[in-house]
Amino acid sequence: MQVSEAESVVMEVLWEAEASRRAPLAAEEVVAALAQRQDWQEATIKTLLNRLLKKGAIKASKDGRRYLYTPVLSRQAWLMDESEGLLQRLFDGRVAPLVAHFSRHRKLGAKDVAELRKLLEEIDDGKP
């Protein structure tokens, strides 16, 4: 499922609410949460909520005169789609060139290298 960058900001608010057991959220609550992060008008946020509804990324339930929004798309599923798309677009679906790119541009710190070594050892040991 394709979620735009702006839509992902709205999704983050809904995922955070879900993780902290505050979901579902009304549109006003989403607007209030985003007022601290973005300089968006209420109409923009409601448009983004409607787009996410049409895509099936969120669901809405009626609560009196308002709607409450809950994520359907999990953050983990979105992250997997996004990372696989990035990997495919930029590195022909291969992880090694991605790591090499960051290594060449000095974006890997000692902690990153240690974590990568540990992951490789786990793969060698047959662990997922």
Predicted regions and their residues:
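Short, hydrophobic-biased segments on the C-terminal half of alpha helices
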Residues: 46-50
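Glycine-centered, phosphate/nucleic-acid-interacting loop/turn motifs that mediate DNA/RNA or nucleotide
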Residues: 56
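Short, cationic-aromatic polyanion-contact patches
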Residues: 4-6, 63-82
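Short acidic, hydrophobic short linear motifs in intrinsically disordered regions
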Residues: 20-34
